[in-house]
């Protein structure tokens, strides 16, 4: 077990790598330039690294634990700069929090401790990097997925997601007719779905004042709708794109079946599904993080996130313990004021080094 001393000063190497990565745009699917920066960092530190068929940066080594985070970011230009913040210097720029801060911390710790590393692509769009990775290699002994949790936070759970497209067609007619048209059918189906999932999920916690937590609920969201008279004027057509977030008390099949059960007209083409995950806080890797965070003077926080991450894909494919961890405030994900406190980065690197030393 590592007895790491609390960080006493800036981690210059980590801060320089973070700035280099944030200065290099990597909006999916154009991550190549940033991947090259990452490969160069590993090679400069005498580690073998390569870019695989889909664009992931692979640096295989000790598989006692795999450190992985994503290279890509969402769009949005934020001038890269360092500002003095309330808690010291902050690096501003797109991706500084989501997820080049975690990516940097994991890469630095992987080089210093000799554990395996992968920087994946496409997390913000289709998780093509993570999907390829689980198909291309065996499970490691443990996984740390990099996303912002705060240097003292450990994320154990994510909801899954189901995506689909509702399609309905009805005969055209005068709007005074009482029969529902395709647009009304779409509205009726979606209203029924929202009502269906307004009640508690099986086994979810109930609070008399606030009800079940968001993490424990299915949350349906319409994301796009189109409707109107067809080009030939003979029909009313509607398409409705939807997403439903899935808590661990459901499977994605459960949610699809329940949503399909509310259909009275039209059909749903389900296009994607990612299962939820809830990891145990009692695994060796979770314990190693608690010890390492306390070693840096922190009070470990165990987190559950209402979104979905690449850890969902790893958990569905690999039978090994895992957590998600990384510096940064996740409230700044995708935000116009995205920035990372650099002392967060320093502490996260120290935590990750201690975890790797504990597990190897």
Feature names for model-found ranges:
Residues 92-104, 123-124, 180-183, 339-346:
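Short, conserved micro-motifs enriched in small and acidic residues
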Residues 104-163, 167:
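Acidic/histidine-rich catalytic neighborhood of metal-dependent amide-processing enzymes
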